[in-house]
Design a protein with these regions (language model features):
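Conserved catalytic-core subdomain
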Residues: 1-17, 26, 169, 227-353
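Short, Gly/Pro- and small/polar-rich lid/capping loops
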Residues: 1-49
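Active-site-adjacent loop/helix segments that line or gate small-molecule/cofactor pockets in enzymes
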Residues: 25-33, 47, 60, 172-220, ...
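Short acidic-glycine loop/turn motifs at beta-strand connectors
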Residues: 35-42, 68, 75-80, 87, ...
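Conserved phosphate/anionic-ligand binding catalytic regions in large, soluble enzymes, centered on
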Residues: 56-73, 301-305
Length: 353
């Protein structure tokens, strides 16, 4: 169990307008930091006023992308209490990421304790407005000043928090996606991790998508370039002739917490779910045959993002007449209902602060 010291700020910030929060724009009064080195392991856990970090310019994180991160939220329920959604899954995923990136990891229970501690300390920053939440960003960075390519001897685990607005400020609406020539991940790589390099390398395709009038990129596998894997920075699902398909998490696909939750809910509802590899050709054929019923992405930020149009090699699939699908909508309402405490948590997923 962590021994966390706490220092409250003497200059608290003014709270932002909950009707105009945006995403990742505002930050709470405090942050959590835990140091790590080879001799002491994790030590000096502390909550301090939010402030810039002081790092050596040669810190290895700047030169070799030696870092990892997570993303989860705290939700204000109708009775005013605060809860988290499956934080243990984020903790385990960070352990898996850190193993791949040669970074040290907090045990699951310490990760969850740290998250609960900073949220409780800054609980006044958890917004009350409909659809808002407190986004929580834990991350690990290599801090040793060294330009040789090897593992770092010193690290920091840090959590910052940001009150965020409703992702769909005008309602949940389908987006348009397209497939591009770029590759997100290959077998043996870091596709299953949450490391910054994965996201930086995806931006060029995102820019191209926007230039062509599309919101997101559909990522295919990096070997044969024929199997669907992710959409943008989300997991993706395809409902074809009554069955819901999503890519297997076998090394190139991020094991999303929302993805996992959707699969469990769908199975509870008795809807067939396949985690077999799905060729993009089969998706387009299903569209032409009138069997492509719904497409949606899943992730912490948006929860569920419906897709209304998919472009592949000049061919365009129009999904459900550009309207949100029945299962997509039901999943969104169910997940957000559990997260914000408006529906009973029969799955045991929420953790009270």
């Amino acid at each position: 169990m962590l021994q966390i010291t706490k220092q409250r700020t003497t200059t608290p910030k003014a709270k932002p307008d909950e009707g105009n929060l945006g995403f990742g724009v505002h930050y709470t009064d405090h942050m959590l930091i835990i140091d790590h080195d080879e001799e002491k392991g994790w030590h000096d856990a502390r909550i301090v006023p939010y402030q810039p970090l002081e790092l050596d310019p040669a810190a290895m994180v700047f030169h070799y992308a030696m870092e990892s991160f997570e993303g989860l939220k705290a939700y204000r329920t109708p009775d005013g209490s605060i809860q988290l959604f499956r934080p243990d899954k984020n903790a385990q995923r960070m352990i898996n990421t850190n193993h791949r990136m040669c970074l040290p990891s907090l045990p699951v229970e310490d990760f969850v304790q740290a998250v609960k501690a900073i949220v409780e300390f800054d609980q006044d920053w958890v917004p009350h407005a409909e659809g808002t939440s407190l986004y929580i960003r834990p991350f690990v960075i290599a801090t040793e000043p060294h330009l040789g390519v090897r593992t770092s001897r010193t690290h920091k685990f840090i959590i910052v928090c940001s009150p965020v607005g409703a992702y769909y400020s005008t309602g949940i609406n389908p987006v348009k996606i397209f497939e591009d020539e770029y590759t997100r991940a290959c077998p043996g790589g870091t596709g299953f991790t949450k490391c910054g390099g994965n996201y930086a390398a995806s931006l060029i395709s995102q820019v191209k998508a926007h230039e062509l009038g599309y919101e997101q990129t559909l990522w295919l596998d990096g070997v044969e370039h024929k199997y669907v894997e992710e959409v943008g920075s989300m997991n993706c699902f395809f409902k074809i002739d009554g069955t819901v398909y999503t890519a297997p998490t076998v090394g190139t696909v991020l094991p999303g917490v929302t993805r996992m939750s959707c699969i469990e809910i769908l199975k509870k509802w008795g809807i067939p779910v396949s985690e077999e590899r799905l060729p993009i050709a089969d998706v387009m054929k299903a569209s032409h045959d009138g069997k492509l019923e719904e497409v949606f992405g899943t992730g912490t930020a948006a929860v569920i993002s419906p897709v209304g149009e998919l472009r592949y090699e000049g061919d365009v699939a129009h999904i459900n007449n550009g309207e949100i699908g029945e299962i997509t909508h039901k999943l969104y309402n169910t997940l957000t209902g559990i997260q914000w405490g408006k529906l009973p948590d029969d799955m045991g997923w929420t953790v009270k602060i």
